[in-house]
C-alpha cells in the first residue's frame, strides 16, 4: 500500500486542495491558507447559531476503522457546522468484519452518494489507497493512518502555535515522547519545517526514535530531556503508544516519566512564556503531570477548539477549492 501522498494526488490542476492525505509536498502558501481559513471559522463557533451553509447538500462520511472519539466527534461537528449531512460508519459492525474488502465497502458508500470520506485506519497508506480508488468527484480526508500521517492534527497544532506565538520564523519547538509510533510527530515536523520554524527539537529515548530524522525533517535530536527543553517556546508532548510497541522498548512507564515526563520543575527549563500542548488522550503521570496539563501554560483545551475550525477549513476547501474565505465573507454580507 503506498504511503507517499505528494502534490499530484492532493491538489487539482489549479493547485487547490482535492484530497488531504499528508502534509508532505504541500506548499507553504496552502498551509497558510488553511490556517487563515480556520481563523475565519473560529468566529462561527462563537455565534448563537453555529452554522454556515457552505456544504449544504453535501454528504460527509466518517469511516473509522480505528477508534478515536475526539477526532471523529470534531469531524462530525465540523461537517455539521458547514451544514453538511453526516454519516458515521461503525466499522466493527460493518461488512468488513465479514470479509468485505476496503474497496468494496467504499464502493457501497459511494453508491449512497457520499461526497467526501474522512478515513481513519491502522494501516499506513490506507487514506492514499482510498483516494486513488474513489470516484473523481469524491474527496478523501485522512483522519490518521498507522504511523504515517495525521494532517489535520498537525494543522490544528500549527493554528494553536500561531495564535499563541505569532509567526514561526523565530520559534524553538520541542516534540517529546514516543516519536517512533507517532503519526502526529511526523505531521508536526513536516508542518513546522514548511512554515519556516528554524529550531525543531525531537526528544525521546533512543529506542523510540526513528532512524534518519535529522536528514528527513531537519530536526535536532535529543535523548536528554533537560538539554532538549532548554529555552524552547513550545513543548508538544506525545502519548506513549503501548498498543503499537513490541516488548523491550521501555523499561517501565515510571522510568519514562522520571527521564522524560513534563513536570513543573522540568518545564522551568523552557522559556517562561512557553506553551504546553498534547494531542490527547493524556496519560497523566506518564508523559505529563496533572499540574502541568491543567496549568496556566497549557493550551491543550484550546487545541480541541481549534481542531473544529481546522477541520471545517479542510472539509470546505476540499469541496470548493481555496475560495472558502470569500464564500464565508459573502455569506456574512447577506
Swiss-Prot record:
It catalyses: carbamoyl phosphate + L-aspartate = N-carbamoyl-L-aspartate + phosphate + H(+). L-aspartate binds at residues 98, 183, 239. It comes from the Bacteria. PROSITE patterns: CARBAMOYLTRANSFERASE. Signal peptide: none annotated. InterPro entries: Asp/Orn_carbamoyltranf_P-bd, Asp/Orn_carbamoylTrfase, Asp/Orn_carbamoylTrfase_sf, Asp_carbamoyltransf, Asp_carbamoyltransf_Asp/Orn-bd. GO terms for cellular component: cytosol. One of its GO terms (biological process) is amino acid metabolic process. Pfam families: OTCace, OTCace_N. It is an enzyme of class 2 (transferase). Pathway: Pyrimidine metabolism; UMP biosynthesis via de novo pathway; (S)-dihydroorotate from bicarbonate: step 2/3. Carbamoyl phosphate binds at residues 70-71, 120, 150, 153, 280-281. GO terms for molecular function: amino acid binding; aspartate carbamoyltransferase activity. The keyword Transferase applies. Its EC number is 2.1.3.2. PANTHER family: ASPARTATE CARBAMOYLTRANSFERASE, ORNITHINE CARBAMOYLTRANSFERASE, MITOCHONDRIAL. Catalyzes the condensation of carbamoyl phosphate and aspartate to form carbamoyl aspartate and inorganic phosphate, the committed step in the de novo pyrimidine nucleotide biosynthesis pathway. Belongs to the aspartate/ornithine carbamoyltransferase superfamily. ATCase family. Heterododecamer (2C3:3R2) of six catalytic PyrB chains organized as two trimers (C3), and six regulatory PyrI chains organized as three dimers (R2). This is Aspartate carbamoyltransferase catalytic subunit. The lineage of its organism: Bacteria, Pseudomonadati, Pseudomonadota, Gammaproteobacteria, Pseudomonadales. The gene is pyrB.
Amino acid at each position: 500500500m503506498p504511503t507517499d501522498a505528494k502534490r499530484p494526488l492532493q491538489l487539482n490542476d489549479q493547485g487547490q486542495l482535492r484530497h488531504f492525505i499528508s502534509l508532505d509536498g504541500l506548499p507553504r502558501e496552502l498551509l497558510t491558507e488553511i490556517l487563515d481559513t480556520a481563523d475565519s471559522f473560529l468566529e462561527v463557533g462563537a455565534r448563537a447559531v453555529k452554522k454556515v451553509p457552505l456544504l449544504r447538500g453535501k454528504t460527509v462520511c466518517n469511516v473509522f476503522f480505528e477508534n478515536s472519539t475526539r477526532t471523529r466527534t470534531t469531524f462530525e461537528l465540523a461537517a455539521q457546522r458547514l451544514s453538511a449531512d453526516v454519516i458515521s460508519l461503525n466499522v466493527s459492525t460493518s461488512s468488513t468484519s465479514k470479509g468485505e474488502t476496503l474497496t468494496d465497502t467504499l464502493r457501497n458508500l459511494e453508491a449512497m452518494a457520499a461526497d467526501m470520506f474522512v478515513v481513519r485506519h491502522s494501516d499506513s497508506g490506507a487514506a492514499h489507497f482510498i483516494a486513488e480508488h474513489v470516484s473523481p468527484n469524491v474527496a478523501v480526508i485522512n483522519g490518521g493512518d498507522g504511523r504515517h500521517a495525521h494532517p489535520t492534527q498537525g494543522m490544528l497544532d500549527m493554528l494553536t502555535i500561531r495564535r499563541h506565538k505569532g509567526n514561526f520564523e523565530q520559534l524553538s519547538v520541542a516534540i517529546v515522547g514516543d516519536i517512533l509510533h507517532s503519526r502526529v510527530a511526523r505531521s508536526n515536523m513536516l508542518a513546522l519545517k514548511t512554515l519556516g520554524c528554524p529550531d525543531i527539537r525531537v526528544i525521546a529515548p533512543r529506542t523510540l526514535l526513528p532512524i534518519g530524522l535529522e536528514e528527513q525533517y531537519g530536526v535536532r535530536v535529543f535523548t536528554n530531556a533537560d538539554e532538549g527543553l532548554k529555552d524552547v517556546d513550545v513543548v508538544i508532548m506525545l502519548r506513549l503508544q503501548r498498543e503499537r510497541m513490541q516488548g523491550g522498548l521501555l523499561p517501565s512507564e515510571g522510568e519514562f516519566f522520571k527521564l522524560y515526563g513534563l513536570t513543573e520543575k522540568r518545564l522551568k527549563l523552557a522559556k517562561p512564556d512557553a506553551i504546553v500542548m498534547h494531542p490527547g488522550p493524556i496519560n497523566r503521570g506518564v508523559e505529563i503531570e496533572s499540574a502541568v496539563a491543567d496549568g496556566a501554560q497549557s493550551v491543550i483545551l484550546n487545541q480541541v477548539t481549534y481542531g473544529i475550525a481546522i477541520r471545517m477549513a479542510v472539509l470546505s476547501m476540499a469541496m470548493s477549492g481555496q475560495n472558502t474565505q470569500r464564500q464565508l465573507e459573502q455569506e456574512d454580507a447577506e
